[in-house]
Amino acid sequence: MLRQFSQTQQSRVRAQLELLLRNAEPGERLPSEPALAKRFDVSRTTIREVMSQLETEGFVQRRQGSGTYVRH
């Protein structure tokens, strides 16, 4: 049950982040993980997992020490 809840949270966050990405310009920096976690009322772990998926799929680029950027 906990895993199912986690996947549901990830799906909800991913949908919200995809909307955010659609309205962003390539190269635009996204809010920090803590800011996104607070905005979507989830843990930073959930944000990290979704960002990792989006990076693997080429939607964002994460730069250590700098942030996460839109790739389109």
Where are the predicted features?
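Extreme N-terminal segment that seeds HTH/winged-HTH DNA-binding domains in transcriptional regulators
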Residues: 1-44, 49-52, 56-57
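Beta-hairpin "wing" of winged helix-turn-helix
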Residues: 29-30, 55-65, 69-72
